[in-house]
Regions:
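Primarily the internal scaffold of c-type cytochrome electron-transfer domains
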Residues: 4, 47-53, 61, 76-144, ...
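Amphipathic alpha-helical scaffolding segments comprising HEAT/armadillo-like alpha-solenoid repeats
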Residues: 491-501, 523-535, 553-564, 587-604, ...
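Short coil turns that connect the paired helices of HEAT/ARM alpha-solenoid repeats
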Residues: 502-506, 534-540, 565-571, 609-611
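Helix-start (N-cap) detector for alpha-helical repeat units in TPR-like alpha-solenoids
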Residues: 508, 539-542, 570, 614-615, ...
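Structural marker of alpha-solenoid helical repeat scaffolds
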Residues: 521, 536, 552, 567, ...
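Structural signature of tandem alpha-helical TPR/SEL1-like repeats
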Residues: 524-525, 556-558, 592-604, 627-639, ...
Length: 782
């Protein structure tokens, strides 16, 4: 798998935008997901040897047997797997696995030249280390195979780091057979959060779970060391089929010592047979086929989703067949991960795209199109689509309006456009959508027409489509307008979002996204939408409804979220625990208190599992703070800063905790420490300004609050607070001018409009005050 989870973003996306979004500290979520995990479910394999063939292995229980035990019987499947990217997801660095040029090859980036060479049969790179000095590092493992290969370097604390200089393994005629940097348009040097020695490129957390089988991270917070282990170094048979020891015993003995259920399962932990006995038939000769039996489970899709989804791990020990949301928390269709219409933007790894699709809604599974053992398509070109969609109807110029043998005649050219990640890795969008240049013209979303016709604009493309079909394009995904309205804080955004959330005909992942996009102030209609979401049979919708309640009044949170403390899925239980962490015990019934304590223990365990990350420590610190445990909260937030001094939310949250504790002088010190690390971080300057206000140092506060607006002019909240500070110091004209300027960019910002009404009223200008009061009234009613 060339998909490297150490990069959770498109290298070509603007660094400043994504960095800012990652560092928003209010209600910290790690990589747009809660980071978690908890108690350990120990599994291993028949051979208890701790080391074999140089691989670090788990040797705890008799369950994982290794792919070699499988391919001895399943030769056809094994042969396909041996040639797959799953097989080559990770390997020990040797003459067979290493594809890159290590014959004293040189590569220069950011003014520094790295040299790739061999010594005593081993592979090395001389490159910039975390201290900025050129150092020799041994390449320990290869990572991926095509279209690029990365290399892992092991440090003394057993931390593996992914080098940001990768090998382009494509043929030379395609531009390959060269070294290249994954961030070619940026200047990533030591100290940068994206430097290869930093947490963002750490294999143990960012990559390992998807590139090896049955991974155990084994981080020790007391020593800040790892002892990461796996059952198999790459993605083996058991990564998808589950531990195979019982199946091996069954196959060898044919006299099963199992229960009746185990006999019927042949000792397998999961049966991936959802397509068995299923036929796709056409109700009429020219119609699309219909599945003979509705898809009855998500087993296959969830097995793929463990890696082919943008998600955070909330528990360790996933084995195929267990509920996905017991172990992972997936990202929804939010910006900047997706465009407003749901098209992929950042690296989202397929699952979130596919769940939006009409194919998924009609029962298609991953293996309908992909051979699960080779990873290849079941047919090439339009022939794959023609297994369901009539070629005579769709593979014709009357449908696609392009030359029959041209690139535009390919089904995927229009319905699965590519986005290139990691510089050279194009990946197709699996939302399988109808091109919508009309949406592009109105909302700024991309479309596949202009992906090829780059010399034309979206309105031209929309006109062409209308001429071809006599109408605007019509797609299955209908939520773009609502999500775009939410981004723009449009007056009707909330109503549009509620409509999407309530429409069972929309994809569940879109309905879930609509719920989390509902923003404060949460009126009765929004709370009703969330209450309905909490009762929804779809788990993603329930989880999103909980997330959306973070801005609800305490009484509403308790009333609505308490029943979810006993949900069947762990991701939902711990979200409910986090949401209700600050509820006083005397407000809870005995049953609620018991459920909250149990779910809170799961939440704490989930963050403890990720104690190697500053994000996990901040999450835990905030949780303790809401529970009233200030001592442990301070400890965790300080630990986060020590673990990763570049993680800005740790400073902001610790300072905010000191505010709650009445220790603003200490908060000021923390914020100034953070500003030394990130002098251009607007959040820290804004927080420092507020701290100085509380410390009665108004002039100093005004400097910091203004600095925040300069560093982040697009943040309406910063402008609003700065204007309030100006007004409080008697600078009414300057305050009003600042607010009016911000209102031009954010015409529907309630705080700005309300402040203008208030400021004009305070100076006796009733006409202007009424104008803005009426505007606010209209906006609120909408």
């Amino acid at each position: 798998m060339a998909q490297n989870k150490s990069r959770k973003r498109n290298a070509n996306t603007l660094k400043t935008e994504q960095k800012h979004r990652r560092l928003l500290w209010s209600g910290i979520a790690f990589l747009s997901m809660v980071i978690a995990s908890g108690m350990i479910y120990f599994v291993a394999y028949l051979n208890p040897t701790a080391e074999r063939d140089g691989e670090k292995r788990v040797a705890l229980a008799v369950q994982y047997v290794g792919s070699s035990a499988c391919v001895s019987c399943h030769a056809t499947e094994g042969s396909a797997w041996l040639k797959s990217q799953h097989h080559d997801a990770m390997a020990q660095a040797d003459e067979h696995s290493v594809l890159g040029n290590f014959n004293n090859a040189r590569f220069t980036y950011a003014g520094l030249t790295s040299t790739f060479f061999k010594r005593d049969g081993k592979f090395f790179v001389n490159t910039e280390g975390r201290d900025g000095k050129l150092t020799d590092y041994e390449i320990t493992y290869t990572f991926g195979v095509s279209p690029l290969q990365q290399y892992l370097i092991e440090f003394p604390d057993a931390r593996l780091q992914a080098l940001s200089i990768a090998w382009d393994s494509r043929p030379k005629k395609d531009g390959g057979q060269r070294w290249f940097h994954l961030y070619p348009k940026e200047r990533i040097t030591h100290g940068d959060e994206l430097h290869w020695t930093g947490p963002a490129q750490n294999w143990n957390f960012m990559c390992a779970d998807c590139h090896s089988t049955e991974l155990r991270k084994n981080y020790d917070p007391a020593t800040d060391r790892f002892q990461t282990q796996w059952a198999e170094i790459s993605v083996g048979c058991e990564a998808c089929h589950g531990p195979g020891s019982n199946h091996v015993v069954w196959a060898k003995s044919q006299s099963p010592p199992f229960s009746k259920g185990e006999v019927s399962s042949k000792g397998l932990t999961i049966s991936l047979d959802e397509r068995r006995g299923v036929a796709w038939t056409r109700p009429s000769p020219d119609s699309n086929p219909v599945r003979s039996r509705a898809r009855s489970s998500e087993r296959e899709i969830e097995v793929c989703a463990q890696c082919h989804a943008r998600r955070g791990q909330i528990f360790e020990g996933y084995t195929p067949g267990k509920p996905f949301l017991d172990y992972y928390r997936p990202a929804l269709l939010r910006r900047p991960l997706y465009y407003a219409d749901g098209q992929q933007r950042d690296e989202v790894y397929i699952w979130g795209s596919f769940l939006q699709s009409k194919m998924y809604a009609n029962g298609v599974t991953c293996s309908d199109c992909h051979n699960p053992h080779s990873g290849k398509l079941r047919a090439e070109g339009n022939s794959l689509c023609a297994t369901c969609h009539l070629g005579a109807k769709y593979d014709t110029p009357a449908h696609h309006h392009h030359k029959p043998d041209g690139a535009g005649a390919a089904c995927v050219a229009c319905h699965m456009p590519t986005t290139t990640y990691m510089v050279i890795d194009p990946r197709r969008d699996h939302s399988l959508r109808v091109p919508r240049p009309d949406l592009s013209a109105n909302l700024g979303t991309p479309n596949s027409c202009n992906g090829c016709h780059t010399n034309r604009d979206a309105r031209w493309a929309a006109t062409q489509v209308k001429q071809w079909y006599g109408r605007d394009a019509q797609g299955y995904q209908r939520f773009a307008s609502a999500f775009s309205a939410a981004d723009a804080a449009a007056p009707d955004a909330q109503a549009q979002l509620r409509a999407i959330a309530a429409d069972a005909g929309d994809p569940a992942i879109a309905r879930a996204t609509a719920l989390v996009e509902l923003s404060a102030p949460l009126g009765p209609a929004a709370l009703d939408a969330m209450a309905a979401g909490l009762r929804d049979p779809n788990a993603l919708v329930r989880l999103a409804a909980l997330q959306s309640l973070s801005g609800a009044p305490p009484d509403a949170r308790l009333r609505l979220a308490a029943p979810l403390l006993a949900d069947s899925l762990r991701a939902i239980r711990i979200e409910a625990a986090n949401l209700l962490a600050g509820v006083p015990e005397d407000r809870l019934s005995t049953e609620q208190r018991t459920a909250l304590d149990r779910a809170a223990q799961e939440y704490v365990a989930s963050q403890r599992y990720n104690a190697d990350r500053a994000e996990g420590r901040v999450n835990l610190g905030n949780f303790y703070a809401r529970r009233g445990d200030a001592e442990n909260a301070v400890t965790e937030l300080k630990a986060a800063i020590k673990l990763n001094p570049n993680f800005i939310p740790a400073y902001a949250n610790l300072a905010d905790l000191y505010r709650v504790l009445g220790r603003d002088a200490e908060g000021e010190s923390v914020l100034r420490e953070g500003i030394k690390v990130a002098p251009k971080n607007a959040i820290l300057h804004h927080a420092l300004g507020l701290a100085l206000v509380r410390l009665k140092r108004a002039d100093d506060a005004l400097v910091e609050l203004e600095r925040a607006t300069v560093l982040e002019p697009g943040n309406p909240r910063f402008a609003y607070v700065y204007a309030v500070a100006l007004h409080s110091m008697g600078k009414s004209d300057a305050a009003i001018a600042r607010l009016k300027k911000s209102l031009l960019a954010y015409p529907n910002d309630r705080d700005i409009i309300e402040a203008l009404a208030s400021f004009y009223s305070a100076r006796g200008d009733k006409a202007e005050a009424k104008k803005y009061a009426d505007r606010l009234h209209t906006l609120t009613n909408n």
